[in-house]
Amino acid sequence: MAHKGKAAPAKPPTSHKKEVKSLKRKRGQEELSTLRKAIDEFDLKSTPKAFAELPLSEPTAKGVRDSHFETLTDIQARAIPLALKGRDILGAAKTGSGKTLAFLVPLLEKLYREQWTQEAKLGALVLSPTRELAVQTFQVLRKIGRHHLFSAGLVIGGKSVREEAEALSRMNILIGTPGRILQHLDQTHGFDVDNLQLLVLDEADRIMDLGFQRDVDALVQHLPTTRQTLLFSATQSKKVSDLARLSLKDPEYVSVHAEATTATPSTLQQHYIVTPLPEKLDTLWGFIKANLKSKMVVFLSSGKQVRFVYESFRQMQPGIPLLHMHGRQKQLARLDVTKRFDSSKHACLFATDVIARGIDFTGVDWVVQVDAPEDTDDYIHRVGRTARYEREGKAVIFLDPSEEAGMLKRLERKKVPITKVTAKDSKKKSIRDELQSICWKSHDVKYLAQKAFISYARAVHRATERDEKHNENSDQVFKFDKLDLEGFAKSMGLAGAPQIKFQKGEDVKRMKNAPRAPLSSGSEDESGDDKPRRRKKDEVRTKADKMFERTNQDVLSKHYRNLVEDGENDEEEDFFTTKRVLRGDELDEAAGGAGAGLPTAKTIDLGGTELVLDSKRREKLIKSKKQLAKLKGKGQKLVFDDDGVAHPLYTLQDEDDFKQQGPAEALRKQFVEQEGDKVKEADIDDKALAKQKKREKKLKRKARERGEAEGNGGPQLAGGDDDDEDPLEMLRSLPMAGTTRDSGDDESEDERPKKKPKKWFQDDSDDERKPKSKVIELDHEPDTLEDYEAIAAGLLDD
């Protein structure tokens, strides 16, 4: 009878779970093989119009659809199919044409088809020229890749390097700026890029312009050569072509607007206003007051100008929210400004070219360029902040009368349509008195005005030198001498134009791109010494001490104090000015010989450069070869003819002298014949030398064979006797290759000894020569121990 009790607990359906996982894995493999087959069969000649027509995976297609991207732009329709097939791409398209999706979609598909996991580490790398563009690209990636399981990271400057380093080893996709990524490659342990599948360079021309060329070159050397590379830019330059040649393999050049009639979107209306430099700020104020219900971006040439215009206009309250952005701001402040301006309906953003590339702001109505850009590519990228994705937009640029002709000629060459407009008199208003009042009340704004004026003047001066060097007079935009700088300074509220010290363009550019030095924490003495005053550890500080040590907490106070000190020093130095520098002998003549008894400075001529030894430090300079080499000119290679006359090693012949020698074909034949004769003469000598070497080799071989046949351990030469002369004497008398023997060499004292000196353990007798080996003949094979002992005794016996 069966036992009746409680039923046993049911076992968990583990087999069912395993079966479900197996089916899911199998279904995924089938979908992956179907996707790969669809990509291979996709016709590149077709022109898809929507994302649904592309062979995309389900997570990517769903992410694109949820982000409300449906229609393909021209660059997306041509670049995405090529990238899906694994081709390297060099893409060029107008700004605002959707290049970001053109490389993000293939990036996700590449990792999805490779079944990339977190253990495989970094699989895709995206380089952006600016932090703002990197942040925007990362946000788009999060939207369209929300249904994937990849881990993505953002690496830009202004954030903690240690926090970034801790998360880098877990990233599959990385977006950042070249400098910070190269820093992690050199310093971060565990950051591995050996398995990288895809490299993307966004706005490559801007990456080159910002001085990242060395960083990118060093970065590419770290990456594997089997990667796929996508390079996108709105404009192409020589640096971009060089980068493409080094980093791309058989690239596909995709240029959707190469044959377009205009280089800018057709929905963009472009205008220019001719206004003198002293009236630019008045025109800008009137333009802002006339468009209070608009969203605009105002570009200026430097960060100091941005700060001055923002601070002064903010105090004048135009009636629209004002924001400003430049490269010297902290990263969190830049992100906050970007977010606030993007979410605003009506706002005015003063900015430098830091946001001129790739940044997509929502609903920008106007792009205003107060200062002319350095080239037309910068103009195209600036106006690209509006009229994006087939939307309408407007742009205006303020030009000085001296800049009008050159800028219009450049824009016409780049196929940029632009029309001239004039500002209404009713909209014009002079704000010179208001700015002067603000500068009088606020020393900080006055300091900003001075620095803004200096930075603008230096930028125009540098651009003028570059235009004069590379462009024709008709194509020159910037003309420093024709600008009314005195009137411009007064229009900014200053009493006059500040003094400017111009430097070389490369030095200014290097200083501008250099990182900021850390702020000094020490305080200077009242006496003006640079060394910080040390305070004792146990010294008691009273309230009075703290009050006297307190300084203005305003960020501009220290800079303004330095500016005031510099101005006071300039005024003191202006009392005595240097008119002429007299040498020692000229000073004696001027003094009528009164100083003849005093010591004068010595002068040394260093190949055309005179070195005055007027101090001990200058005298020590003579002992340093490295320092003297800097003062001397570069050497020239000279050759001397038969008469002893020196000539340069390399001389160029002009065209007339070359034609006098005869036709080129006859000279070529003559040269070929002369070289042929030289080859024949050299061939005769080579054959004779080879024949002699062959004969010597044959004689040596025969002598060695004869010596082995005689069994005396070495060859015996004819006529030689061991007791009379050295058997090697005849060999020493033979001529050696590359040496000559004279009759007097035998009697010279430097002649090498014929025989090697004997060691202490060798016999001094020359008459007795020991044989090298001794042979004992045996009648029978030894069998017993006595036989072996007898053989050993015979060998030991001399």
From Swiss-Prot:
ATP binds at A93, K94, T95, G96, S97, G98, K99, T100. Residues 16-30, 529-544, 666-689, 767-781 have a biased composition (Basic and acidic residues). GO terms for biological process: rRNA processing. PROSITE patterns: DEAD_ATP_HELICASE, HELICASE_ATP_BIND_1, HELICASE_CTER, Q_MOTIF. Keywords: ATP-binding, Helicase, Hydrolase, Nucleotide-binding, Nucleus, Ribosome biogenesis, RNA-binding, rRNA processing. One of its GO terms (molecular function) is ATP binding. Residues 280-435 form the Helicase C-terminal domain. GO terms for cellular component: nucleolus; small-subunit processome. Residues 80-254 form the Helicase ATP-binding domain. ATP-dependent RNA helicase required for ribosome biogenesis. Involved in the release of U14 snoRNA in pre-ribosomal complexes. Required for pre-rRNA cleavage at site A2. Belongs to the DEAD box helicase family. DDX10/DBP4 subfamily. Interacts with the U3 and U14 snoRNAs. Associates with pre-ribosomal complexes. This is ATP-dependent RNA helicase DBP4.
